[in-house]
């Protein structure tokens, strides 16, 4: 059976690394990697050849296609009827893509629909990406901040530690809390799910309570949209914190919907220069 790994049009990620290809080859699959597919992730074509991958101009016309982003209409047309596509497809946000995939007779596995359960943890690629996003947010913020995160005592005087507010304490938020705390910052965090307070405090951060959210968590463990009353009280908290903290990192997300916009321009203007 053939597996195709296409080059992503606007993403530096690749669906299979040379290590992954080597594992697939041991299982008996023939792996076809599109020219330059791994360059954005620092894997050249030779790295795939060395582990048994075949470099091709088009990897979409295979039995199984592993991709990161959703395919274009032209790429879908390249796929064989009865083939299987494994990718991040966001079916709740783009149901028309799901219909086009079904109309062409393609089997689809959307990696962003893997439930957040211990049994499915090994397949939870979305949480893996969220972990990286939270960590990177702190790294980017530290670079832009311009001074130490941790407090300093020097001959010229004392420098206070940075204060970081993390909104949303899912996988990305907890990763951001851990990274900021390890750099010596004072970390505060808040979430619509008050039950996450214990996780936050165990990581050395302070949990800021807004109030009991009305059904703030779904049955699969993800946050849900909150009511107007909670949103108003949360906005008051964000506005007050914006005047005190040095850095705000927002990781709040609702599956299947655009991420909520929680920080206004006025809040940003009120932050310390």
What are these regions (language model features)?
Residues 8-9, 35-38, 70-71, 90-91, ...:
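Short, ordered loop/turn segments at secondary-structure junctions
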Residues 80, 271-272:
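Helix-to-beta-strand junctions that scaffold the AdoMet/dcAdoMet cofactor pocket
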Residues 7-43, 150-241:
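Glycine-rich phosphate/diphosphate-binding loop of Rossmann-like nucleotide-binding domains
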Residues 55-56, 84-88, 107-111, 187-189, ...:
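Short hydrophobic/aromatic-enriched beta-strand-loop microsegments
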Residues 2, 73-163:
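Glycine/serine-rich phosphate-binding loop and adjoining beta1-alpha1 elements at the start
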Residues 1-100, 104:
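An N-terminal-biased, well-structured beta-alpha scaffold segment characteristic
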Residues 52-61, 71, 218-248, 252-265, ...:
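A structured beta-alpha segment of the ubiquitous adenosine-cofactor-binding alpha/beta core
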């Amino acid at each position: 059976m053939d597996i195709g790994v296409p080059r992503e049009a606007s993403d530096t990620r690749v669906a299979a690394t040379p290590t992954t290809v080597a594992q697939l080859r041991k299982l008996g699959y023939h792996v076809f990697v599109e020219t330059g597919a791994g360059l954005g992730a620092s894997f050249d074509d030779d790295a795939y050849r060395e582990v048994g991958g075949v470099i091709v101009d088009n990897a979409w016309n295979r039995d199984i296609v592993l991709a990161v982003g959703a395919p274009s209409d032209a790429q879908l047309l390249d796929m064989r009827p009865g083939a299987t596509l494994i990718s991040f497809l966001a079916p709740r946000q783009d149901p028309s893509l799901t219909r086009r995939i079904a109309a062409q007779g393609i089997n689809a596995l959307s990696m962003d629909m893997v439930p957040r359960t211990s049994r499915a943890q090994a397949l939870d690629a979305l949480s893996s990406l969220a972990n990286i996003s939270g960590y990177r947010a702190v790294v980017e913020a530290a670079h832009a901040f311009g001074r130490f995160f941790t407090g300093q005592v020097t001959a010229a005087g004392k420098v206070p530690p940075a204060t970081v507010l993390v909104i949303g304490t899912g996988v990305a938020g907890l990763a951001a809390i851990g990274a900021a705390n390890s750099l010596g910052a004072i970390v505060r965090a808040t979430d619509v799910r008050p039950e996450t307070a214990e996780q936050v405090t165990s990581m050395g951060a302070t949990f800021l309570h807004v109030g009991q959210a009305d059904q703030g968590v779904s049955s699969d463990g993800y946050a849900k949209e909150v009511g107007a009353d909670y949103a108003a009280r949360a906005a008051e908290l964000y506005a007050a914190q914006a005047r005190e903290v040095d850095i705000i990192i927002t990781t709040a997300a609702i599956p299947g919907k655009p991420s909520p916009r929680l920080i206004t321009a006025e809040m940003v203007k009120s932050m310390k220069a």
